[in-house]
C-alpha cells in the first residue's frame, strides 16, 4: 500500500470516522427547504424498449410507467458512451472520455480509476453542504483513493464493478452459464472468457468488505433497504442530500430471486425487469413519503442492451440498426448505433417537473452534472470545459431545446476507444467508423471506415437502415457542417484541461477479505445501521 493511499485513508477516516458508517448526518446550518435533494438512479444494460412507457410490448415496468405519467419522459436521451465505466465517468464529471480520461472499462485488478484531478458531482455537492451517498455498481476504480468514499461520497454500499466480474454461490442466469465459487482449496475453472472464477464478488459498505461472495438473490432487497435508510436519515438531518444508485439490473447474471419463483413461466429477463421496477418503486415511495416536494428523481441507463446475451438481453425498441445488422454483428451495447446509447430516461419532481409530458429534446447523461449543480445553487469548476448542458428549462417544461450536437464515442465495437467518430447534428447522424458488437449468434460485424461518412436522417429512419445518397443535395448540405463540428470539438479538447486514466493492472489490488481462501471467501460481518443523527 503506497504512502499516498495511507495519507488519503488517514485523512478520510479522521474526517468521517466519528460516525459509522462514515456519514455525518448532523445539521450544518443548511435546511432541506433551501436546496433540493437529488436521487439519480442508473440502470445497467437496459434497452430503450424495456420501458413500457416507451414500447407497448413491454409489460414489466408498472412503477416506472407510473413515474412517467407523473413526470417527464425523454425519448431522445443518450448515454455518454455505450459501455459501463466511460458512461459512469461522464455522468459524474459532465465530460466525455477524451476529457476525463475514462475511455474503456476498469478491471478487477485495475490499479487506477477515474483520474483524481477530475471533479465529481458528489464533490461539488459535498462542498455545497450536501450529504452524499452512493449505492450499487461503481466501476470507476476501487483501489486506494479511487474508492467512492474518496470521490465525494460520504456513504457507499455496493459492488465496486459489474456483478459478473466475480464468482458467487448463486450464479444466476447468464449466457453462457458460469460456475459457482469454489468451496474447497482448488479453483473452479471455466473455459468461457466471460466467466470470472478466481475471486468471489465482493460487497462493500464504505471501506469494508461485508460479504464475499455476494448473495445475488438478496442484493436488490439490500440495495432498497440501504437506499431507504439513507433517504430517511438524510431527510431527518435537515441537510440536503444526493443519492446516486447504480443498479445491478439489467446486467447479467440475472439473479434467481423469490420474485423469479413467483413469476414461473415468465422469462428470466422479464422477471428481472419486474424486480428492478419494484426496487425503483420502493425508492420513489420513500421519497414521496419523506421529501416529495423537494426531491428531484432522475432515472436513466448507462448504455443499451448486451445483445450477445441472447434471451437475457433487453429490447432496443425501434432502434434496430438495420444497416449494421445486414453487415453482421449487433447494433446495441458497445456500438455507436442508436441501440447502443439511446436509453430510457424519466424525471420526477412534483410541483416542478410537469406531469405526463414527453420531451423530444436531445439530451444526454452528460447533462446530469451541470443540471444538478445548477439546481443545487452550486458552481461548476472553472478550470475545464464540459460537454453537458443545464437542462433545467427542458425539465420544467419551458423549452424543448436540448443539444444541437452530440458526440457518441467509440465503445469497443469499432475504432479506438473513446474516439469521436460518430456525430449527431439535429436529426442527422454521421458515422466515420462502423462495426457490430458480438451478436447472439456469435457473429461480429467487421470494422469499416467511412470518409466521407455514412449519414442517416433519424427523423425518417430511426432504424438506421438506409444512409443518405452521397450525391444528394441533403447529404452535401450536411457534410460540411459535420466536418466543421468535429474539427471544432477536437481542437477544443486539445486545449482543455484533460486527464488520462491509469489502466495498469496488478493482482495485489484485487478486493479480497480472506486471502487464505482460493476465492477470498469470508463470512458476512453483519450489516450496520445508519447513525441516529445525534451530534
Curated annotation (Swiss-Prot):
Name under which the protein is recorded = Arylsulfatase G
Q: What residues bind substrate, as annotated?
A: 137, 162, 251
What is this protein for, i.e. what is its function?
Displays arylsulfatase activity with pseudosubstrates at acidic pH, such as p-nitrocatechol sulfate. Catalyzes the hydrolysis of the 3-sulfate groups of the N-sulfo-D-glucosamine 3-O-sulfate units of heparin.
Instruction: Tell me which positions the record assigns to the signal sequence.
Output: 1-18
Q: Which cofactor does it need?
A: Ca(2+)
Could you give a GO molecular-function term held by this entry? metal ion binding
- What reaction does this enzyme carry out catalytically? an aryl sulfate + H2O = a phenol + sulfate + H(+); Hydrolysis of the 3-sulfate groups of the N-sulfo-D-glucosamine 3-O-sulfate units of heparin
The EC number(s) attached to this protein equal: 3.1.6.1, 3.1.6.15
Q: At which residues is glycosylation annotated?
A: 117, 215, 356, 497
Q: Which residues form the active site?
A: 84, 139
Task: Give the cofactor note.
Answer: Binds 1 Ca(2+) ion per subunit.
Superkingdom of origin organism: Eukaryota
- Name its cellular compartments: Lysosome
Which residues are recorded as binding Ca(2+)? 44-45, 84, 302-303
* Gene (name only): ARSG
Amino acid at each position: 500500500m503506497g504512502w499516498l493511499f495511507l495519507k488519503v485513508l488517514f485523512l478520510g477516516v479522521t474526517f468521517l470516522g466519528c460516525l459509522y458508517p462514515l456519514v455525518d448526518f448532523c445539521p450544518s446550518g443548511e435546511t432541506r427547504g433551501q436546496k433540493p435533494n437529488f436521487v439519480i438512479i442508473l440502470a445497467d444494460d437496459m434497452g430503450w424498449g424495456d420501458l413500457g412507457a416507451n414500447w407497448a410490448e413491454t409489460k414489466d415496468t408498472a412503477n416506472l410507467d407510473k413515474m412517467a405519467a407523473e413526470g417527464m419522459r425523454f425519448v431522445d436521451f443518450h448515454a455518454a458512451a455505450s459501455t459501463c465505466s466511460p458512461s459512469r465517468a461522464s455522468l459524474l464529471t459532465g465530460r466525455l472520455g477524451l476529457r476525463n480520461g475514462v475511455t474503456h472499462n476498469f478491471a478487477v485488478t485495475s490499479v487506477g480509476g477515474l483520474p483524481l484531478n477530475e471533479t465529481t458531482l458528489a464533490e461539488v455537492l459535498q462542498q455545497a453542504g450536501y450529504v452524499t451517498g452512493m449505492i450499487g455498481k461503481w466501476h470507476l476504480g476501487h483501489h486506494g483513493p479511487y474508492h467512492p468514499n474518496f470521490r465525494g461520497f460520504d456513504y457507499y454500499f455496493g459492488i465496486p464493478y459489474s456483478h459478473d466480474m466475480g464468482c458467487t454461490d448463486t450464479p444466476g442466469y447468464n449466457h453462457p452459464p458460469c460456475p459457482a465459487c469454489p468451496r474447497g482449496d482448488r479453483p473452479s475453472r471455466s473455459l468461457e472468457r466471460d466467466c470470472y472464477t478466481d475471486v468471489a464478488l465482493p460487497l462493500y459498505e464504505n471501506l469494508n468488505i461485508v460479504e464475499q461472495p455476494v448473495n445475488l438473490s438478496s442484493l436488490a432487497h439490500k440495495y432498497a433497504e440501504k437506499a431507504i435508510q439513507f433517504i430517511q436519515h438524510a431527510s431527518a438531518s435537515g441537510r440536503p442530500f444526493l443519492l446516486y444508485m447504480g443498479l445491478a439490473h439489467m446486467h447479467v447474471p440475472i439473479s434467481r430471486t423469490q420474485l423469479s419463483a413467483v413469476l414461473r413461466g415468465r422469462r428470466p429477463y422479464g422477471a428481472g425487469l419486474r424486480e428492478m421496477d419494484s426496487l425503483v418503486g420502493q425508492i420513489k415511495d420513500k421519497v414521496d413519503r419523506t421529501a416529495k416536494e423537494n426531491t428531484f428523481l432522475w432515472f436513466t441507463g448507462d448504455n443499451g442492451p448486451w445483445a450477445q446475451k441472447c434471451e437475457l438481453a433487453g429490447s432496443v425498441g425501434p432502434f434496430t440498426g438495420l444497416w449494421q445488422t445486414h453487415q453482421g454483428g449487433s447494433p446495441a451495447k458497445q456500438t455507436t448505433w442508436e441501440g447502443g446509447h439511446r436509453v430510457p430516461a424519466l424525471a420526477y419532481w412534483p410541483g416542478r417537473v410537469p406531469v405526463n409530458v414527453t420531451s423530444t429534446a436531445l439530451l444526454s447523461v452528460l447533462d446530469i452534472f451541470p443540471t444538478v449543480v445548477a439546481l443545487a445553487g452550486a458552481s461548476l469548476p472553472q478550470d475545464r470545459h464540459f460537454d453537458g448542458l443545464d437542462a433545467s428549462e427542458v425539465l420544467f417544461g419551458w423549452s424543448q431545446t436540448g443539444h444541437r450536437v452530440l458526440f457518441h464515442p467509440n465503445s469497443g465495437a469499432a475504432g479506438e476507444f473513446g474516439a469521436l467518430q460518430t456525430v449527431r447534428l439535429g436529426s442527422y447522424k454521421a458515422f466515420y467508423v462502423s462495426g457490430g458488437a458480438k451478436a447472439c449468434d456469435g457473429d461480429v460485424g467487421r470494422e469499416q471506415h467511412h470518409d466521407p461518412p455514412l449519414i442517416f436522417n433519424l427523423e425518417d429512419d430511426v432504424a438506421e437502415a438506409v444512409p443518405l445518397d452521397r450525391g444528394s443535395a441533403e447529404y452535401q448540405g450536411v457534410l460540411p457542417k459535420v466536418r466543421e463540428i468535429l474539427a471544432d470539438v477536437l481542437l477544443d479538447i486539445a486545449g482543455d484541461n484533460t486527464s488520462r486514466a491509469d489502466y495498469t493492472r496488478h493482482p495485489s489490488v484485487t478486493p479480497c477479505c480472506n486471502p487464505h481462501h482460493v476465492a477470498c471467501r469470508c463470512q458476512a460481518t453483519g450489516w450496520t445501521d445508519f447513525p441516529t443523527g445525534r451530534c
